């Protein structure tokens, strides 16, 4: 009996340091993966309003605006003013992109509808962002509600409110999570065009890790999910599923889009169509080729077709005729 106890103690002394080392290594790797993916590689603007304005009179009217987020951080975006009392639409880009990726859509949407259009850089994105990290749709949802408040405070030259009562949001990938979450907080968000919607923030970060670190992608993505708990323990990382959030959005107009170019989000977007309440006005097109996820690399014809689908949706859903 004494020999058995001594043997157990010896094994414990031998294995305990190994176990501790493994736990520390896993924790360190998990937090490192989250830290790296939460700081996106900076992407230069594809085009700026100054350059775009040389080709488009409407594009020349884009202004660079700043406002304050709910947490006191600074936000920025390009703004195209529409007609007085017309709806406004916010365009939210995907992870790793920036506001220039939605500039062309924003200008065409404004031209076709005379809606006010806001194209923000989501936190951690764009050139020299004031907040250098992303929370994969969590803080970004609060930022979107701050953007809505910014729109509400816009005035005409005569000091009347510029934007009408209804708001629409276009969200791509990470932007779609922010859009859904913001809509749950603000009933004035009447229309949502959502493309390549992740199941939740965990699946968003898993996809990002697999893309940036494809070696052992299944293992690294699981490590990253573990790392979100200590890394964002005081942050606004949200773990609710897009389906659970969608269940609260009664009476909204929704356009769901996805495609084969982003299969990791095609299935989750298709399943999301079953989550909205029965009184939602829902349209789903999940077999696009390509979806908005890679539309930036598509031909001019395909790009125009995609943009027109989004424009037609908002024009019908928000009910404001072009002026």
PLM region descriptions:
Residues 181-235, 267:
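Hydrolase active-site cap/lid region
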Residues 95-108, 268:
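The serine-hydrolase catalytic nucleophile loop
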Residues 110-129:
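Conserved alpha/beta-hydrolase
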Residues 86-94:
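Short beta-strand element of the alpha/beta-hydrolase
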Residues 134-158:
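Alpha/beta-hydrolase active-site loop
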Residues 159-173:
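Alpha/beta-hydrolase fold nucleophile elbow
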Residues 10-67:
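An N-terminal hydrophobic leader/cap segment in hydrolases
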Residues 67, 75-78, 225-322:
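Serine-hydrolase catalytic core
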């Amino acid at each position: 009996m004494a020999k058995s106890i001594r043997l157990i103690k010896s094994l414990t002394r031998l294995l305990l340091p190994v176990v501790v080392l493994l736990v520390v290594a896993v924790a360190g790797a998990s937090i490192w993966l989250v830290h790296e993916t939460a700081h996106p590689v900076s992407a230069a603007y594809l085009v700026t309003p100054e350059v775009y304005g040389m080709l488009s009179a409407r594009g020349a009217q884009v202004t660079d605006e700043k406002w304050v987020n709910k947490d006191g951080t600074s936000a920025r975006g390009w703004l195209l003013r529409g007609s007085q009392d017309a709806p406004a639409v916010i365009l939210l880009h995907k992870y790793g992109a920036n506001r220039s990726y939605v500039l062309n859509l924003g200008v065409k949407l404004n031209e076709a509808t005379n809606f006010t259009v806001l194209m923000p850089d989501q936190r951690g994105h764009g050139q020299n962002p004031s907040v250098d990290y992303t929370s994969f749709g969590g803080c970004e949802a609060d930022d979107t509600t701050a953007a809505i408040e910014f729109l509400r405070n816009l005035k005409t030259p005569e000091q009347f409110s510029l934007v009408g009562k209804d708001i629409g949001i276009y969200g791509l990938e990470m932007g779609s999570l922010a859009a859904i979450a913001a809509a749950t907080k603000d009933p004035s968000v009447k229309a949502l065009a959502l493309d390549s919607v992740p199941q939740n923030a965990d699946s968003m970060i898993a996809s990002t890790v697999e893309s940036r670190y494809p070696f052992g992608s299944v293992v690294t993505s699981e490590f990253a999910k573990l790392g979100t708990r200590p890394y964002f323990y005081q942050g606004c990382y949200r773990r609710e599923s897009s389906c659970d959030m969608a269940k609260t959005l009664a009476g909204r107009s929704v356009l769901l889009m996805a495609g084969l170019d982003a299969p990791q989000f095609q299935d989750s977007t298709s399943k999301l169509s079953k989550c909205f309440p029965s009184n939602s006005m829902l349209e789903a097109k999940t077999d696009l080729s390509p979806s908005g996820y890679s539309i930036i690399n598509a031909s001019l014809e395909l790009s125009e077709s995609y943009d027109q689908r989004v424009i037609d949706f908002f024009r019908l859903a928000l009910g404001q005729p072009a002026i």
